[in-house]
């Protein structure tokens, strides 16, 4: 064995080195085609993305008037018109929307070019392997350099050392990840004010990329107080296009954002299942899980004050409620949640803060599963945020109690008519379509890059037309309840195998109409059982009270509802496998050659 190692040590070392380089991503065979873009004097590499349809080159808006230089593996070429371009040649003549013929490894494959419009570009550079490390855990942090360029190509910010980290709860499991950014020094990014901490929202469950932005804009325009500002950016990491993100101010207590004095604090309602992930959590007298997010070292009196707030909400005393809460802020946040159909309203990511001796609701956050995008909020003609019961084990305590208050209801109706309805009318008539049109090119690029993920997750029509239709129907329903005083009852259906409810609004003393809802079986074959008593409810009888009904089907019906999950991510990168196999084969060839050489007798010696 010792002789074997001595004779073959060089080959073994070469094999090991190639394997390590492959694992680090430094030496991968057949690197994808790329272009080098000159952005405000700096060169940025943009690598093409490959799927079953060929290669896709996603260029940022700032590349429109920039010089482009082609990067190709040895022997590869790109046909542009009558010209054959090879590695290092100018390719500024390529146009978005065109498909070019790429010769790679002796085969012709299509290369489709896209270019964004109206959107800034965020370039991040990290060491090889950094993103894999980050994706192993949200607790992992890494350093990167950052370059932010406006759509016109002007540099807006550069930072040689930003801290990059994963974030999110349910959104973290998706292939397109959300991140947090911490700059080395506070800076004003795209006109949102100077700060060090920022968030990159991935909108992985929102193919329209509109939901979070619309909810934030609705809150800001309604006067809810400080609301995180946001801008769309195309994100590139080490030359790879990660898609369209929403660069957003982080919810923090600091000057220029949510401003709090000594003795004041910011809290967030969360699911109890997330207890171990929370910083400074506690449970209220009624069992709510609350996280103290600011200050970092809270005063011992915070829990007692929150319990006083909770007692006032459930007291039934409007005078006490007005003395304890800023009722208008709670009404405004409720209106944002109800209008948007926020399924997590008053359950998770639900912020409130204590300032000037009273409790305020807000800022708003997390609307990527709103606007009818799930079975739980798909019906626009229903109350979604108001019902106290959201499902088995899911209780919206505060909204449920507040909606019983005459003071709260009167402020909801007045604010809806005076402030929210004009905003909704502008959104429906102009604003949503205008925003969607401005993102058309960026959304197309994002949806092609993440087509496989979206196909797996899709639960609702992602088109702008569907969003407009949903919001229009929702506005019509809420106006009938709050302006026309139609008396509604809420009926919630629990399907077998589901722990959440489907909400319906029924005019008092009318029959629930389920004709437009696919129950996967004939209505006559389903038993509707009252959740409170277990008694059978005649679905053809008038509804006189709020009801939760559990559906009981004949054996074998309905088929189980698929639960969308993020597609599994393989830890094996094909390029790494190819490089490792190549290194192994090279080593094997070397060993065979060495073995043959060792077996050959010296010249002039008898065998």
Enumerate the predicted regions with their spans.
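Conserved oxyanion/phosphate-binding beta-strand-loop segments in alpha/beta enzyme cores
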Residues: 142-151, 155-202, 298
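Append "Rare intracellular matches occur via the same short Y/T/C beta-strand/loop motifs
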Residues: 68-70, 95-106, 514, 545-556
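Predominantly extracytoplasmic/ectodomain segments of secreted and cell-surface proteins
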Residues: 19-95, 103-113
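C-terminal membrane-anchoring or membrane-association module
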Residues: 585-607
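N-terminal Sec-pathway targeting helices
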Residues: 1-15, 573-577, 592-599
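Middle-to-C-terminal accessory/interaction subdomains
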Residues: 170, 288, 296-347, 353-499, ...
């Amino acid at each position: 064995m010792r002789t074997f190692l001595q004779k073959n040590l060089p080959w073994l070392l070469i094999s090991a080195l190639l394997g390590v380089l492959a694992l680090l991503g430094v030496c991968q065979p057949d690197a994808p085609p790329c272009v080098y873009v000159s952005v405000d004097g700096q060169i940025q590499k943009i690598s093409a993305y490959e799927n079953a349809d060929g290669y896709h080159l996603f260029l940022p808006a700032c590349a429109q008037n920039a010089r482009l230089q082609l990067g190709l593996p040895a022997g590869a070429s790109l046909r542009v018109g009558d010209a054959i371009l090879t590695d290092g040649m100018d390719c500024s003549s390529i146009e978005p929307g065109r498909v070019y013929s790429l010769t790679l490894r002796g085969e012709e494959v299509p290369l489709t070019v896209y270019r964004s419009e109206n959107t800034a570009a965020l370039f991040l550079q990290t060491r090889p392997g950094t993103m894999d490390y980050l994706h192993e855990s949200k607790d992992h942090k890494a350093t990167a350099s950052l370059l932010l360029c406006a759509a016109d190509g002007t540099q807006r910010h550069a930072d040689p050392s930003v801290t990059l980290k994963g974030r999110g709860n349910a959104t973290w499991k998706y292939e397109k990840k959300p991140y947090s950014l911490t700059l080395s020094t506070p800076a004003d990014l795209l006109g949102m004010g100077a700060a060090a901490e920022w968030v990159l929202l991935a909108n992985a469950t929102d193919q329209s990329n509109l939901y979070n932005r619309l909810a934030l804009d609705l809150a800001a325009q309604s006067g809810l107080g400080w609301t995180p500002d946001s801008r769309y950016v195309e994100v590139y990491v080490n030359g790879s296009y990660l898609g369209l993100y929403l660069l957003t101010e982080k919810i923090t207590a600091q000057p220029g954002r949510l401003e709090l004095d000594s003795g004041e604090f910011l809290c967030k309602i969360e699911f109890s299942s997330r207890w171990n992930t929370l910083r400074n959590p506690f449970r209220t007298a009624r069992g709510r899980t609350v996280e103290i997010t600011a200050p970092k070292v809270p005063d011992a009196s915070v829990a007692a004050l929150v319990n006083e707030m909770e007692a006032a909400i459930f007291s039934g005393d409007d005078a006490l409620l007005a003395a304890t809460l800023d009722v208008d802020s709670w009404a405004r946040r409720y209106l944002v949640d109800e209008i948007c159909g926020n399924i997590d309203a008053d359950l998770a990511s639900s912020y409130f803060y204590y300032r000037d001796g009273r409790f305020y609701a807000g800022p708003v956050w997390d609307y990527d599963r709103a606007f009818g995008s799930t079975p739980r909020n798909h019906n626009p003609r229903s109350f979604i945020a108001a019902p106290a019961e959201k499902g088995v084990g899911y209780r919206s305590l505060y909204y449920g109690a507040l909606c019983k208050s005459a003071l709260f209801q009167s402020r909801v109706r007045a604010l809806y008519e005076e402030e929210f309805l004009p905003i909704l009318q502008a959104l429906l008539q102009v604003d949503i379509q205008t925003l969607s049109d401005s993102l058309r090119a960026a959304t197309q690029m994002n949806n092609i890059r993440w087509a496989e993920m979206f196909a797996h997750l899709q639960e609702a029509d992602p088109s702008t037309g569907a969003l407009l239709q949903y919001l229009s129907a929702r506005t019509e329903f809420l106006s009938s309840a709050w302006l026309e005083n139609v008396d509604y009852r809420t009926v919630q259906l629990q399907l077998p195998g589901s722990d959440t409810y489907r909400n319906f609004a029924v005019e008092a003393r009318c029959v629930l109409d389920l004709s437009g809802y696919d129950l996967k079986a004939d209505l006559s074959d389903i038993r509707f059982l009252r959740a409170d008593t277990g008694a059978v409810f005649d679905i053809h009888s008038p509804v006189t009270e709020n009801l939760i009904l559990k559906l009981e089907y004949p054996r074998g019906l309905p088929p189980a509802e698929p639960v969308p999950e993020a597609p599994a991510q393989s830890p094996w990168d094909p390029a790494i496998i190819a490089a490792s196999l190549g290194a192994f084969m090279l080593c094997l060839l070397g060993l065979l050659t060495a073995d043959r050489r060792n077996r050959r007798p010296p010249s002039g010696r008898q065998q």
